[in-house]
Design a protein with these regions (language model features):
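Extended, low-polarity segments enriched in aliphatic/aromatic residues
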Residues: 2-60, 66-79, 84-367
């Protein structure tokens, strides 16, 4: 049975601006039917890496937060720390980056909570029912503490997943640093010797005695290592690193399984804005020009159908001249495969459907 995906274009006038139109979209799509009264509501979004300007403006987040508050809910904006070195690898830097990009209580009407804590190791292990690659997903604690979960996604391309949509925002985004490692990595971490200062933090955090300090440097015993990634979170010099070696198909399937861990068993709703569709992730410290014109706003209770509708909407557009999707050979009707030919984005939606998260069949309802 097809799921309903609601769509609003980006036309606006004196009687209704785009924030008001988003509110109407949420109402029409049924978000108001969720019982928000006295509930803690996680609004999951990406605050943007410093230097990137393609992330969603704080005004969009405020519109969603206000909708929740008007119905008695207690919203907060949230994301988890990144696995790689950058402006969001710990909660302090992450908060600074969010504020630098305009996110704060005054601009969004609610507080920001970095879900996996100061060092990215405040996590909950959540069973993945039917998981083939992940049995227990490592999810940021604040995400799982919320009574209601709302995803607010900037839909764009992604260099590893093919595109970054609702499932990517939830599955990868809600993983703790160890959870992100599990998705990206098919092996175990190693220590970059020239960065290691021999402080022993990795040894202290490891429950399996895998890190060994020898000659003032840490070395990881892979026979003891279980690949939990906690050593990555505590290393002050980012010397503990992973091999980014998971296949794109397996990565996408793991993203789907992590998404299932987040959304199972509680009210959820999903919003995706197909605007400023950059070819790469908002995790990058820059953003290339959009690959297609702005399309509009989409909303649904079904995250799989939502992603499918957004993909179809982007692929129906003519690529912008001079963009990464302009010209080239092959994949004429798949802009994401054109710009990232080695990716397999369909595997995420197919696996999500198999897991029962949603369906790729949808009915598009324009408001």
């Amino acid at each position: 049975m097809a799921s309903k995906v609601y769509f609003a274009d980006l036309r606006a006038d004196y009687h209704e601006n785009l924030q008001q139109k988003l509110t109407r979209l949420m109402k029409t799509a049924g978000m108001g039917n969720i019982d928000f009264q006295d509930k803690y509501v996680a609004i999951k979004l990406h605050f943007g890496e410093p230097g990137n300007l393609a992330f969603l403006r704080p005004n969009w987040a405020k519109t969603v937060a206000d909708f929740v508050k008007e119905r008695g809910g207690k919203p907060f904006l949230t994301d988890c720390n990144t696995l790689y070195v950058g402006g969001r690898k710990n909660a302090l830097d992450h908060m600074d980056s969010a504020m630098l990009n305009g996110f704060g209580p005054m601009t969004t009407g609610c507080q920001i909570i970095i879900a996996d804590g100061l060092k990215g190791n405040d996590e909950v292990e959540v069973p993945v029912v039917g998981g083939e690659y992940v049995k227990n997903a490592k999810i940021g604690r604040a995400v799982m503490d919320a009574d209601v979960f709302i995803s607010l996604t900037h839909f764009k391309g992604h260099e590893e997943a093919g595109f970054g949509g609702c499932l990517k925002n939830i599955g990868m985004g809600c993983g703790s640093r160890a959870g992100k490692m599990e998705q990206h990595n098919a092996g175990k971490p190693h220590v970059k010797q020239k960065l290691c200062i021999g402080c022993g933090q990795c040894w202290k955090i490891c429950a399996h005695g895998a890190p060994i300090i020898a000659d003032g440097k840490a070395v990881i015993d892979h026979d003891r290592c279980v690949g939990c990634g906690r050593c990555i979170a505590v290393c002050p010099k980012n010397a503990v690193q992973i091999n980014w070696d998971e296949t794109t198909t397996n990565l996408n399937r793991k993203i789907a399984e992590y998404t299932k861990a987040v959304v199972d068993g509680r009210p959820c709703f999903h919003i995706s804005l197909v605007i400023d569709v950059s070819p790469n992730c908002d995790c990058r410290p820059e953003n290339d020009m959009p690959i297609v014109p702005n399309v509009g706003m989409f909303a649904s209770f079904d995250p799989v159908a939502l992603d499918m509708a957004c993909v179809d909407a982007v692929n129906a557009q003519t690529p912008l001249r001079g963009s990464a999707a302009d010209g080239g050979e092959g994949h004429a009707h798949d802009h994401f495969r054109r710009i990232h030919p080695d990716t397999d984005w369909r595997s995420c939606l197919e696996h999500g459907e198999k897991l029962g998260i949603g369906t790729r069949e949808y009915e598009l309802i324009k408001i």
